[in-house]
């Protein structure tokens, strides 16, 4: 055996002996397992049967996250009523520094530092509820605003989302059950530092505010009934506001919406409010005063073609059509009065106009409410009413399914001297007839031919409205000629009746 072989054998022997001594010494130095003899939270009991029935408690979930035990180890310990105490750690005297509040944009709860801090804190407060003591200490050290910003970051990570939810709900419960610490949702708005001039941050923090509002309401005004969601808008609304989605006045105040100026359109939560309105109106078919104000604001914006607002009437009208609402329902929702002489100038009328057009496409027939609306417009000679009449005429002409016979049916029109003089809707019919004839240069058989024949007859010679109708048609053909027999006959009769020269 060479000298080298002897040397290697000696080194191996010494190494194995030292390792055995180390292992023996290390095991002897370990503390004995801590048995749950006093049922304290320092030694957390684990009842597998109870957890199987009820699911993991929030305390269990929080402790499992802090201890970060592998899944296999949890299975092995599932039938035991003991847990091994975590290794003793040096008490951290400056937990605020440990939480690094100067870097709250990071997910602090995911860090190993936070876990060590939480373990140390629980060791010092073994007789208290784990999530309560952690929540309280974080609130004290971070202060409320930073505390919730930390939880907001943690909620974005699937690994810490559940822990963030536990801590958030724990603080909500403390505020709602400890009288001297109670704060209202309006005060919590300020805690979250919601700023209308910072829309991204506002919308990111708004769900936290709404969760507290729901929690606060559940404690002080418990309710269980919720709407049955019909679409994604309903689902989002119910998710945001819970069973309290009908508390629209309170919600508007909580969001700090301004309905008296165009600043409404710059509010980050404007669409949240509009979605709430859609769900609310589908259910109640009656608008609250703040909703009527909203329609007026949106109507003004649509009239001005302001960016992102011109489509609001379309969105609401389509939803009302899908909900099978009738014209009278929409009139009520918009807070309109079809007998009001200022109906055309009401800014919310733009919503009604869009709805009527979509409604008539699906129901091209007379509707009592629609006929009354056209009659009101026909009797109004204001600039706004004339513009609306012109717009409706254009709509009828560009929509193929609206033949002259269909339009006449929608107006519930009768061609007679008595009807013409007493029904203002005749004015809109004549505007339609005039544009149709000038555009097409022919007069087809049916309502248009009957109208020209009536106007050219002596039976209607003395009517005031009849004279205005003749003048309207005749002036449109000034300097023009037509090869259509009916049109030529009318123009000849019109000149004779009114002593006009062709």
Swiss-Prot record:
Subcellular location: Secreted; Host cell membrane
This protein's GO CC annotations: extracellular region; host cell plasma membrane; membrane
Gene name linked to the record: BLN06
Carbohydrate attachment residues: 38
Lineage, highest ranks first: Eukaryota, Sar, Stramenopiles, Oomycota, Peronosporales
Natural source organism: Bremia lactucae
Free-text comment about domains: Has the canonical EER motif, but lacks the canonical translocation motif RxLR, which characterizes most oomycete effectors identified so far.
Residue numbers covered by motif dEER: 50-53
Protein name per its UniProtKB record: RxLR effector protein BLN06
Entry function: Secreted effector that triggers a robust hypersensitive response (HR) in Lactuca serriola LS102. The response to BLN06 was visible as chlorosis but not as strong necrosis.
Domain of life of the organism encoding this protein: Eukaryota
